[in-house]
Amino acid sequence: MKPPDRPTPGRTDRILGVMGGMLRACAVPGQEGPQERDPLGPGSTKTESECTEEDQTGEREREVLAWAPQPESYSIAGSEGSMSASAVSGLAALSGPSSGLSSHPCSPVPPGPVTGLRRWLDHSKHCLSVETEADSGQTRQCENWMLEPTLTTGQELPELTLLTTLLEGPGVKAQPAEEETLSQAPKNEEEQKKTALERSMFVLSELVETERMYVDDLGQIVEGYMATMATQGVPESLRGRDRIVFGNIQQIYEWHRDYFLQELQQCLKDPDWLAQLFIKHERRLHMYVVYCQNKPKSEHVLSEFGDSYFEELRQQLGHRLQLSDLLIKPVQRIMKYQLLLKDFLKYYRRAGMDTEELEQAVEVMCFVPKRCNDMMSLGRLRGFEGKLTAQGKLLGQDTFLVTEPEAGGLLSSRGRERRVFLFEQIVIFSEALGGGGRGGTQPGYVYKNSIKASDPAVSQAWIKQVAQILESQRDFLNALQSPIEYQRRESQTNSLGRSGGPGVGSPGRMAQVSMHTPINGSLPSLLLLPRGEVPRAPLPLDTQALSETPLTPYDPPALPTVNSPPGQARLAKLDEDEL
C-alpha cells in the first residue's frame, strides 16, 4: 500500500489550528470560546433539539478534557517554522470564523476542535497500520512523515504522538528473543573458551609453584640431613644403613632442581610443551619406582632411630617437618602429577585446543604411580628367597581366601586370608601383618608359598585361565540377575554340541566350589594342594586335582588321576568392580 503524501503547508496550518484550539480549551477548562454570531439575529431563540445537540457536544468535549493531559511548554513545528503552545492558542483565537475549521452557521453540531482532532488521530492510526503492511523502504518513509518530521534546519519535532499513545497504549518495538539468543551465542561460546583457557593456565601455574616447593622440601633432606650426617658422622649402630634411609632421593632432587623445574617454567610461555615434557621423561620418572621399592626398608630403619638421632638433627637444623614427613614427599608428588594433568587436560579440551599428546602424558603419569604402588607393596614382603626383580613384571596383586588341605587330604573348613602377587614367572602367596594400613602404617607381608612358571607359555596359559574364570563369574552374576536369559543362552550352547555338564562358566560349578569356601564371600577363594608334590605337566585352572586319599562325601565325581603344579588354585571370586 502506498503511503500518504506529505502534507501541504496549508494542511499543516489547519492541523496546528485544531491542536491550538484543543490546548486553549485545556488551559482554561471553564472558559468558553468566542461567542459565535447567531444567523437568526439577537432576538432569535433556539429549538429544543438544537439545545439538546449542544448539550451532547459539551459532554463529549468534557469527556475529552477528562483524559487529555495538561499542556506543557513544547514547540510545534510545521514546514513554516515553530511556535509555542501559547502562540498556537493565540493563533487559534485570532483565526476565529475565518479559519477553515470554524463552526459552520448552518451546521447543527459544529465540528469544533475535538472532532477535527479525532479525525486527525484516526488518520494517524491508519498511517501506523500501514507500517506493518508496507515494505521496509515505504515503512521508513511513512514512519518519518507521521512520527518524526523534521525542520528544514535539521531540528527534530517533539513527540506529536502523545495523544495517539494515550488512545492506543505505549508500543515498544523489542528485538525478537531468537535473534537476541543467536547474536549472543557466539559471544558466550568465545567467553567460555576464554574462561577455560584461563583456568588451564591457573592449573599450570599451580603445577609450577608446587614443583618449586617440592624442590625446596627435597633440598632440606639432601642439603640438610644428608650433608650434616656426612660432616658430623653417624652413630655406630646406624653406620652402613644410612643409605637405606634416603634411597636414591639425592638423584631425584638433582634432576628436579637442574632440569625438570626449569622446563616446567618454560611451559608457562608455551603450554603445548607440557605434554611432550612428561612423555620425554617417562624413563627418567621410573627412578620413583626404585625409591618406592626401597621405601618400606627406609621406614623400618627410621622407626628405630626416628625418635632419638633424627629428632636431634631436626632441632639442630631448625626444620619444622620431621624427616619421615619429608621422605614421603616423593611418593605424594608422583601421585599428584596425574591429578594436575587431568585438570589441565579437562580445561584445555574445553578451550578447543589439541589434546592428543596431553592424553598420552596423562596415561604415562597414571602408569608410573601404579608401578610405584606395586613396588611399595613388594618392598614389604619378607622371607622370599630370591630376587623379586628377576621374576618379571608384576601383573597384579590382590587379597584372597586360600584353603589348604590338612592331614589326610581333607580340606580345612576355614580359609586363610593371603596376599597374592602375580608375576610373569611366579605367583607368590603371603600373609599380611600389621593393622592393614589404618593409622598411617602400611602392613608388611610374610612369604608363605609360591607357584613357579618356568615356561613363558605356561605363564600365558595361567593368565588366560584367570581371565576365563573371571569371565565365568561375570556370567554367573548375569545368571543371578537374568536367569531366563541365561537359560536361553545355555540351551543354545548345548544345541551346538558342547558338553552340558557344569563347566567353567556354569553356576553349578560355582556352587560346587562354594561347598568348601567359608561363609564370608567378600574375598576370593583359592585351593592349594599339599606341599612337596611334584607336577608332571601343567594343567588348566578349571581341572579338578585329586589326591590319592579317599574321596569325602562332598567331593565331586572322580576324574582321571593327574598331578597338577604345587598350589594349583581355583578362583571363586566375583569381581568386586562388577558388583
Curated annotation (Swiss-Prot):
The species this protein was found in: Rattus norvegicus
MF annotations from Gene Ontology: guanyl-nucleotide exchange factor activity
Keywords of the record: Cell membrane, Cytoplasm, Guanine-nucleotide releasing factor, Membrane
Gene that encodes the chain: Arhgef25
Protein name: Rho guanine nucleotide exchange factor 25
Keyword Membrane: yes
Region annotation Disordered: where it falls in the sequence: 27-61, 172-194, 487-516, 546-579
Region feature (Sufficient to bind activated GNAQ): 472-498
Subunit structure: Interacts with activated GNAQ and GNA11. Interacts with RHOA, CDC42 and RAC1. Interacts (via the DH domain) with POPDC1 (via the C-terminus cytoplasmic tail).
PANTHER family from the UniProt entry: PLECKSTRIN HOMOLOGY DOMAIN-CONTAINING FAMILY G MEMBER 4B-RELATED, RHO GUANINE EXCHANGE FACTOR-RELATED
Domain PH: 380-499
Domain DH: 199-375
Functional note: May play a role in actin cytoskeleton reorganization in different tissues since its activation induces formation of actin stress fibers. It works as a guanine nucleotide exchange factor for Rho family of small GTPases. Links specifically G alpha q/11-coupled receptors to RHOA activation. May be an important regulator of processes involved in axon and dendrite formation. In neurons seems to be an exchange factor primarily for RAC1. Involved in skeletal myogenesis.
UniProt GO cellular component terms: cytoplasm; extrinsic component of membrane; myofibril; plasma membrane; sarcomere
Subcellular location: Cytoplasm, Myofibril, Sarcomere; Cell membrane
Listed InterPro entries: DBL_dom_sf, DH_dom, PH-like_dom_sf, RhoGEF_Guanine_NuclExch_SF, SOS1_NGEF_PH
Comment block on domains: The guanine nucleotide exchange activity is autoinhibited by the PH domain.
Main location: cytoplasm
Family annotation (Pfam families): RhoGEF, SOS1_NGEF_PH
Important for binding to Rho GTPases, as annotated region: 317-338
